[in-house]
Swiss-Prot record:
Homodimer. GO terms for biological process: cellular response to toxic substance. The lineage of its organism: Eukaryota, Fungi, Dikarya, Ascomycota, Pezizomycotina. The keyword NADP does not apply. This is Thioredoxin reductase aclT. SUPFAM superfamilies: FAD/NAD(P)-binding domain (SSF51905).
Length: 334
């Protein structure tokens, strides 16, 4: 364990998910002193959910945007055992700042302080769930697909896929793309516009009459987990009727999970992700601060991409540190 009051590391990494953990491992292998902070909790609140059976490995790797079990806990434990250069802390970092000497300081929720030459943000993102009663329960029970291919292979070929055209998916272009994609996977599609009559009319004029795509305009009163299958959802409508759906698709918007971009006054993209440089890989708008994983890619969140970004982060940070150690220092900025 590093002495938080005296020892200055090469890199502080906030976030122990795929991007942060992979970056920590790669940097440790390159003999850079790394402190990895992870404060994730078990993201599935329902203890009865059998995550091993409900989330296939390929689903987690290729499509998952939802909060998932902490599958990287064993990896972080192994990093701490196998790499003498990496220390893993489960403290929750609450404050970061750049010091006058150009180093970075992080403080946890009990007042411990760490410093390093470089700061890496890989603290992830969180979903903004729509304000529909019961949605959060169905989401946590993983009954809402975030990609049509998430479910068992070929399970939608003879089924109806319900699409919730709410939130970001209530925008016409996004709604159309989503509905057409859903129809590619399912025998039929039912679109819930949640009372948005204008969206319903716009969709009707752009969807083929024989496409087997129905539009339901009645506002949704609540969602309820069904009892016949792990994916079933009962949609209760404001007119008192209910529709049992075997599969429901929706992709909620995402936002940054931590306060660090705001504390460091980092530039953000239009989607709200941390903007990273096109010239200096993974560098943010503040020299010495790098970002990767979901916090730098809100729109495309998969484990494969996060792992790749973690490796890229490590390469970029290592190059900076090694140039500082053995070459002429050149400030990296756009």
């Amino acid at each position: 364990m590093c002495d938080s009051s005296q020892s200055t590391a090469d890199v502080l990494i906030i976030g122990g998910g795929p991007a942060g953990s992979n970056a920590a491992w790669e940097l440790g292998q390159a003999h850079h002193r790394v402190i990895l902070f992870n404060a994730s909790i078990d993201r599935l609140r329902d203890p009865d959910v059998n995550t091993a059976s409900t989330r296939p490995a390929l689903d987690l790797l290729l499509h998952s945007r939802r909060k998932t079990p902490d599958v990287f806990r064993p990896f972080r434990q192994e990093i701490g055992k196998e790499s003498s250069e990496v220390s893993v802390h489960n403290q929750r970092i609450t404050q970061v700042q750049r010091l006058p000497n150009g180093f970075f300081q992080a403080e946890d929720d009990v007042g411990h302080v760490w410093t390093a030459k470089v700061l890496v943000l890989a603290d992830g993102a969180e979903e903004i769930l729509p304000d529909i009663d019961g949605y959060d329960t169905c989401w946590e029970q993983q009954r809402i697909l975030t990609h049509p291919a998430e479910d068992e292979p070929r399970s939608l070929i003879s089924s109806c896929l319900a699409v919730l055209a709410v939130g970001d998916l209530a925008e016409l272009t996004m709604a159309l793309h989503t509905v057409w994609q859903a129809r590619q996977f399912a025998a039929s599609v039912r679109v819930y516009t949640h009372g948005d009559e204008d969206l319903a009319r716009a969709l009707e004029t752009r969807i083929s009459p024989d496409a087997r795509i129905a539009i339901q305009t009645t506002p949704i009163q609540s969602l309820q987990p069904g009892s016949d299958s792990p994916s079933q959802v009962v949609v209760h409508l404001a007119d008192g009727s209910s529709i049992v759906e075997s599969h429901v698709y929706h992709r909620p918007a995402s936002q940054l999970q931590g306060p660090f971009a705001r504390q460091l006054n980092l530039e953000l993209t239009e989607s709200g992700a941390i903007r990273i440089s096109a010239r200096v890989p993974y560098m943010t708008s503040l020299d010495g601060v790098y970002a990767g994983g979901d916090c730098a890619s809100l729109g495309q969140r998969t484990l494969f991409k996060a792992l790749a970004m973690g490796q890229g982060l490590a390469a970029a940070v290592a190059a900076r540190l090694e140039r500082g150690n053995w070459g002429n220092a050149v400030e990296e900025q756009d």
